[in-house]
Swiss-Prot record:
UniProt keywords, alphabetically: Developmental protein, Gastrulation, Glycoprotein, Heparan sulfate, Membrane, Proteoglycan, Signal, Transmembrane, Transmembrane helix, Wnt signaling pathway
Subunit structure: Interacts with the Wnt receptor fzd7 and its signal transducer dvl2/dsh.
Lineage of the organism: Eukaryota, Metazoa, Chordata, Craniata, Vertebrata
Tissue expression remark: Expressed in the animal hemisphere from the 4-cell to the blastula stage. During gastrulation, expressed in the involuting dorsal mesoderm and ectoderm. After involution, localized mainly to the anterior neuroectoderm. At later stages, expressed in the brain, branchial arches, pronephros, tailbud, and at low levels in the somites.
Modification comment: O-glycosylated; contains both chondroitin sulfate and heparan sulfate. Ser-37, Ser-73 and Ser-75 can all be modified by either chondroitin sulfate or heparan sulfate, and the protein exists in forms that contain only chondroitin sulfate, only heparan sulfate and both chondroitin sulfate and heparan sulfate.
Cytoplasmic side: 184-205
UniProt feature, compositional bias: Acidic residues: 44-94
Organism whose genome encodes this protein: Xenopus laevis (African clawed frog)
Compositionally biased residues, Basic and acidic residues: 102-113
A GO MF term: frizzled binding
Gene name of the encoded protein: sdc4-b
A Pfam cross-reference name: Syndecan
Identification of the protein by name: Syndecan 4-B
Glycosylated residues (UniProt): S37, S73, S75
Gene Ontology CC entries for this record: cell surface; membrane
Length: 205
């Protein structure tokens, strides 16, 4: 009898340990450790065209005679100098408003609308501008509340594993209880004692 109880205790402890091991949650930080595939630090790319040029022995030299152009005048003044002076004068000219107040008045800080902006047809443009949100390329670890509320209680893997483990433990306990009753009945004999003598019928008397 003691051996049976000891065997039953070992089976229950094994089932409980297995159910606890299955209900352990996963570490979310380990799921985000991915290896990037965009960088190749070990590989070195060599341009093969440069090697071909050196092997052919082609030298690209600038002809000194091409620098001497026939359009140069004897006075030493070049046409390029005149063009450079014109560009410098254009860059130095700046426009200033002075004390003039610009006609366009923007009130985007309060209402997000802009006023006094006219199109070609003298129509006021009162478009509402919404501030653009910065785009994040990296995935966030935040779980939206809508997805948490929509998922049912019995759809979680932890709940399903716990239910299965509890059912298995209940079956083991029920089977062991039935076996215990059968063994006890065989040891003690019949539960109902039979009478020693048998009563005679009244008809014979």
């Amino acid at each position: 009898m003691n051996r049976l109880l000891l065997l039953l205790a070992l089976v229950l402890s094994g089932v409980a340990a297995e159910s606890i091991r299955e209900t352990e949650t996963m570490d979310p930080t380990s799921m985000l450790e991915y290896e990037s595939s965009g960088s190749f630090t070990d590989e070195v790319f060599v341009d093969e065209d440069d090697d071909d040029d050196y092997e052919d022995g082609v030298d690209y030299e600038i002809d000194s005679e091409s620098d001497n152009d026939e359009d140069y005048s004897g006075s030493g003044d070049d046409d390029f100098d005149d063009e450079d002076n014109v560009e410098d004068e254009d860059e130095e000219e700046t426009t200033t408003l002075g004390n003039q107040i610009p006609e366009h008045d923007f009130d985007e800080t309060k209402t997000g609308r802009k006023f006094d902006t006219f199109n070609e047809n003298n129509e006021i443009d009162n478009d509402i501008r919404h501030p653009a949100k910065p785009k994040t390329l990296e995935p966030s670890n935040e779980i939206p509340m809508a997805s948490i509320g929509s998922s049912g209680f019995f759809q979680r893997t932890e709940v399903i594993v716990a239910i299965i483990a509890g059912t298995l433990v209940g079956l083991v306990v029920a089977v062991s209880f039935i076996v215990f009753l059968v063994i006890r009945r065989n040891q003690n004999g019949d539960l109902v004692k039979k009478p020693i003598y048998k009563k005679t019928s009244t008809m014979e008397v």
